[in-house]
Regions:
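Short phosphate-coordinating micro-motif centered on Lys-Gly-acidic
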Residues: 3-11, 57, 93, 101-147
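Phosphate-binding P-loop
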Residues: 26-32
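Short beta-strand-centered segment that lines the nucleotide-binding/catalytic pocket of NTP-utilizing
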Residues: 58-73
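Short hydrophobic/aromatic beta-strand immediately N-terminal to the Walker A/P-loop
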Residues: 34-36
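P-loop (Walker A) phosphate-binding loop of NTP-binding proteins
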Residues: 38-40
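Conserved lysine of the Walker
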Residues: 45
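N-terminal pre-Walker A segment at the start of P-loop NTPase domains
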Residues: 2-24
Length: 147
């Protein structure tokens, strides 16, 4: 099992502080990073990814690609960015049909919701962004890196 190194923790994150947190997350990612975004249903995975995409100077966020599974963006500052929502993936045959393994070979940034559904094809080294809802409904975000 790979060890995870905690890179940063943000507490009491709200909609008003999320853009600054997103900027800080970008500063910690390596080029062409793969980021598994984890959290309970409703924790704010899609909202957090939207903030990250907006910080990459992409004006129009398409929303969660729940039915399409993959949404591609072209950023003037970060090149290609993929947002994946793997919630609907049910088996390995779907992974093969979607061509996700080949997609992960691209030189791009990847933000993946429900990555546990594709754990067998996750890149060896990647980032984990955990989102938890606090009792006051703010969020705590923790960024880890496999090493």
């Amino acid at each position: 099992m790979k060890a995870k190194k905690l890179l940063a923790t943000w507490t009491a994150v709200s909609p008003t502080t999320l853009p600054e947190v997103a900027q800080q997350i970008w500063s910690l990612l390596t080029p062409q990073a793969f980021v598994a975004v984890e959290g309970e249903m409703g924790a704010g995975k899609t909202t957090t990814i939207a903030a990250l995409i907006q910080k990459a100077q992409i004006e129009h966020f398409e929303g969660s690609p729940t039915f399409a599974i993959v949404q591609a963006y072209h950023s003037p500052v970060k090149d290609k960015i993929y947002h994946l929502d793997c919630y609907r993936i049910e088996n390995e045959a779907e992974l093969i049909n979607l061509g996700l393994e080949e997609l992960f070979d691209e030189s791009a940034y990847f933000f993946v919701e429900w990555s546990e559904k594709i754990k067998q094809i996750l890149p060896f080294q990647h980032f984990w962004l955990y989102i938890r809802t606090n009792p006051d409904l703010s969020r705590t975000l923790e960024l880890y890196h496999d090493h």
